[in-house]
Regions:
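Beta-strand-rich domains and repeat architectures in extracellular enzymes and scaffolds
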Residues: 46-81, 358-365
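Beta-propeller domains
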Residues: 33, 73-98, 166-168, 396-398
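C-terminal capping alpha-helices of c-type cytochrome domains
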Residues: 1-19, 439, 454
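Blade-loop segments of beta-propeller domains
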Residues: 90-121
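Beta-propeller domain segments
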Residues: 18-40, 114, 135-137, 148, ...
Length: 460
């Protein structure tokens, strides 16, 4: 965070240099991503009910597949308000948030609605799970808000739910609100919550909830200070203890080993684990314990980031490994300055520019046993086009760039693309993983869930 302030104070372009600066880089990553011959077969796992009006695409706004840790039961959310439990391969409505949260809204914005969900690792005993959803501005006072002179388009709400019977196929229980945050626009909200799946009882990380908070569109709407001021939470990954009560509102805990808790007189909220993101909408862990976050970029760079406690990942003074001016044209990027090291920014471990795709989605390492060829690979892709990528987890190292490879698909043995399969230019691609480590693909355009079921390697 200090890097952001220093940059804004020091690196303001002079009038004489603005003409040169405004040129920007036209092709920041000239190297192309190549297909290396990996083709993975997909098998349709299930079809979700149409929830969009008049059968318009996307048919079902499905964005996340997760599972209940003890049983492995699969769940999928629909941004329009449904949380499904998969029974015998078919979606059964587990919870309709519209009926439980009367102020719930799923517009405006591509990601507004029931954004994410996560089951507490002790769900089988405590019956607790968590969701994020959107409500109209000023529905209630936000714990994380800003001056009334700045409009709020939506509020994102983090809720804890407690079921009466963890084995039930439909929700019956209670809820309590943990916090809400105002957002300038309907984009880049609180689209990801997750627990560290590697943490065991007694570990520091066990039961701590990670929350990806986007910048809410603040930077592109002219309020870049919301993503740079030290006392703000926009553009960060938070880590909280839902069982604690030492937060300012007394509804959750701030883990004592969070990076900014021990800093005397710090303005930085203790909830912050890492900062400097535009939209950290997918967070995961590799088998060796590395935490990764995909960050959707502005106009040029999509990135995979290796997350470390207290690190700053650059937004809004960096997009990937490139400079941007948050007070100028944020659609331009420039080379790093000679004194870049003084800002202590953690750069992506993998990135592609908009020649390849325009909105990254990730990303999961294959942990299963059914397709040995996929072991040691982290899979991700491009949301709109459905283009598919991977990197080797052995190449993930801070300060270096992992080599991105393209992979392709067949469905039931027939070579195709996701665009062809769902009959839409916009695929709306997302990934999921089950309790056995097998991977899945969700396509919002046609409301389908596919399982990765086989792979072959040919020459690229």
């Amino acid at each position: 965070v200090d890097a952001l302030i220093a940059f804004l104070n020091v690196h303001q372009p002079s009038a004489s240099s603005k003409k040169e600066i405004n040129k920007g880089l036209t092709d920041p990553i000239p190297e192309r991503v190549k297909f290396d011959g990996l083709t993975i077969n997909l098998t349709q796992f299930t079809q979700f009910p149409t929830t969009s009006d008049k059968d318009q695409k996307p048919l079902a706004r499905i964005t996340k597949l997760g599972f209940e840790p003890a049983t492995g039961n699969l769940f999928v959310n629909d941004l329009n308000g449904e949380l499904y439990k998969l029974k015998d391969g078919k979606p059964v409505l587990f919870m309709d948030i519209i009926k439980l949260k009367p102020k719930f809204i799923h517009q405006p914005g591509l990601a507004t609605g029931l954004g994410s969900f996560a089951f507490h690792p002790g769900f089988a005993k405590n019956g607790l799970f968590y969701t994020t959803h959107t409500e109209p501005p000023r529905t209630a006072k936000a714990e994380f808000g800003y001056a009334d002179s700045i409009k709020a388009t939506v509020q994102w709400v983090l809720t804890e739910w407690k079921v009466k019977d963890p084995a039930a196929d439909s929700f019956e229980g209670t809820s309590r609100e943990l916090f809400r945050a105002d957002m300038v626009s309907g984009i880049h909200g609180v689209q990801e919550i997750t627990f560290n799946p590697l943490a065991k009882p007694g570990d520091e990380d066990y039961g701590l909830l990670y929350i990806g908070v986007g910048d809410g569109g603040s930077v592109e709407n002219g309020y870049s200070f919301l993503a740079t001021d030290q006392d703000k939470i926009w553009g960060t990954i938070l880590r909280i203890d839902p069982h604690g009560r030492n937060s300012a509102n007394g509804k959750y805990g701030i883990p004592p080993k969070n990076p900014f808790v021990l800093q005397q007189h710090s303005q930085i909220p203790g909830e912050i684990f890492a900062s400097g993101f535009r939209n950290p909408h997918r967070n995961t862990w590799t088998k060796n314990g590395d935490m990764l976050a995909c960050n959707i970029g502005q106009h040029h760079i999509e990135s995979v980031n290796l997350i470390a406690s207290g690190k700053d990942y650059g937004w809004p003074i960096r997009e990937g490994r490139f400079v941007i001016d948050p007070n100028g044209d944020i659609n331009n990027v420039y080379p790093l300055p000679a004194d870049d090291s003084i800002y202590n920014i953690a750069y992506p471990v993998a990135a592609f520019d908009h020649d390849e795709g325009v909105a990254i989605t990730g990303g999961l390492e294959y942990w299963g046993n059914e397709i040995p060829r996929l072991k040691g690979k982290y899979f991700f892709g491009d949301i709109p086009s459905g283009r598919l990528f991977y990197i080797s987890t052995a190449d993930i190292q801070q300060g270096k760039q992992a080599d991105i490879k393209e992979w392709r698909i067949s469905i039931n043995g027939v070579s195709t693309t996701l665009r062809e399969a769902c009959g839409s230019k916009r695929v709306d691609l997302h990934f999921g993983r089950d309790a056995k480590g097998e991977l899945y693909i969700l396509t919002k355009a046609d409301g389908k869930l596919y399982k990765l079921t086989g792979a072959e390697q040919t020459k690229g």
